[in-house]
Amino acid sequence: MENVYISSYSSNEQISMAVVTTDIRELLSQYVDDANLENLIEWAMEKSSKYYIKNIGNTKSNIEETKFESKNNIGIEYSKDSKNKLSYRNKPSIATHLEYKTLCDMIKGTSGTEKEFLRYLLFGIKCIKKGVEYNIDKIKDVSYNDYFNVLDEKYNTPCPNCKSRNTTPMMIQTRAADEPPLVRHACRDCKQHFKPPKFRAFRNLNVTTQSIHENKEITEILPDNNPSPPESPEPASPIDDGLIRATFDRNDEPPEDDE
């Protein structure tokens, strides 16, 4: 039995991980080569000690059975919620794969930080087998700034009050699918809001050539001093439009005819 010591993020304690196997490196060498072995163990030690959630007991009062399948979730019985002090348990009834049976049995037979360490090892082995990166810290996020650089201030609409470009467009009101929404720009510096610029189109229709020439130019940006738009008006009554005649009871006097 090999004792693997890792340093916790607490300054005054060290966690002793007694892995139930003769040699954890000998077991891992069956799945990964020696070039990835040490890096995988170091990564699993670091992540298991960093993300292990303590002080949550698995009791009947804080365990809730999940409804999703657990056939590919062997060894991950508990997904712990540190905020609400809850544990969500999956029933590990079906083995993941016979290839990892020894490691899965070790996961089921351990607890605490040892279980977390073996879980990270199993995850890393599967990623190495598929040829993908298991360490999320080494994965670079895709930058879409070249395509959607909408947060850059130099492209924002300037504020007509303070001339600042620290503005944000906001959708005030949505309408039907065939109508444009009500959009206003808000300035973070002077706390004013204004209407977005519009395009003024001059249409010159040439009947002989059937061509339309449009000259578009940006109009002046005006501040939005108007009140909020009113609600949609009530539809006209058919009685007021004369489409439906008013009915009367037989005991009422008949209406007078219009002269």
UniProtKB/Swiss-Prot annotation:
One of its GO terms (molecular function) is DNA-directed RNA polymerase activity. Induction: Expressed in the early phase of the viral replicative cycle. The gene is OPG066. The keyword RNA-binding does not apply. The DNA-dependent RNA polymerase (vRNAP) consists of eight subunits encoded by early viral genes and termed according to their apparent molecular masses Rpo147, Rpo132, Rpo35, Rpo30, Rpo22, Rpo19, Rpo18, and Rpo7. The same holoenzyme, with the addition of the transcription-specificity factor RAP94, is used for early gene expression. Residues 220-259 are annotated as: Disordered. Zn(2+) binds at residues 159, 162, 187, 190. The keyword Metal-binding applies. GO terms for cellular component: DNA-directed RNA polymerase complex; host cell cytoplasm; virion component. It catalyses: RNA(n) + a ribonucleoside 5'-triphosphate = RNA(n+1) + diphosphate. This is DNA-directed RNA polymerase 30 kDa polypeptide. Keywords: DNA-directed RNA polymerase, Early protein, Host cytoplasm, Metal-binding, Nucleotidyltransferase, Transcription, Transferase, Virion, Zinc, Zinc-finger.
